[in-house]
Design a protein with these regions (language model features):
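Short secondary-structure capping/turn micro-motifs that flank functional sites
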Residues: 38, 126-128
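Histidine-rich, glycine-flanked metal-binding segment
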Residues: 9, 13-59
């Protein structure tokens, strides 16, 4: 188990705990709250599995509602830009899923910034740019 303890914890239900904690098992959050009671989890949470985040904020993953991550690549320049099709103003046949480069460093940058879900779509210069895809 992983314990993230002593931070300002905000959850999706509107709670905000000043001395809050998040308890994780594997990749799942199993409990959130305030003033963690170590005696309830004796033997299940060892010292190396505790992150003391005093003075920091702990937030749920953010969702990016409109972006071009992976289709206008940060490092590739024009060669990696699959965002726009300039032949016509209406391009509903374009699918972001077909253009995404999963190796684009923008995915790592988004994750480091706390973004865990991306709505990616083509066409910033078209009236109808194409079909979006949501990636988590």
């Amino acid at each position: 188990m992983l314990l993230i303890n002593h931070g300002t914890v905000m959850d999706m239900e509107g709670h905000c705990w000043q001395d809050g904690y998040v308890l994780c098992e594997g990749s799942r959050i199993v409990e959130t709250g305030q003033n963690f009671d170590q005696s309830l989890y004796r033997g299940r949470v060892s010292g190396d599995e505790v992150l003391n985040v005093h003075g920091l904020q702990v937030l749920p993953g953010m969702l990016e509602a409109h972006c071009h991550v992976g289709i206008t690549e940060e490092k590739k320049g024009i060669e990696g830009d699959d965002c726009n099709e300039g032949t016509t103003p209406v391009t509903p046949q374009l699918r972001a899923l077909d253009a995404i480069n999963p190796m684009d460093v923008a995915f790592q940058n988004a994750m480091k910034a706390g973004i865990t879900g991306l709505m990616i779509g083509p066409g910033s210069s078209n009236v109808v740019g194409g079909q979006f895809v949501f990636l988590k």
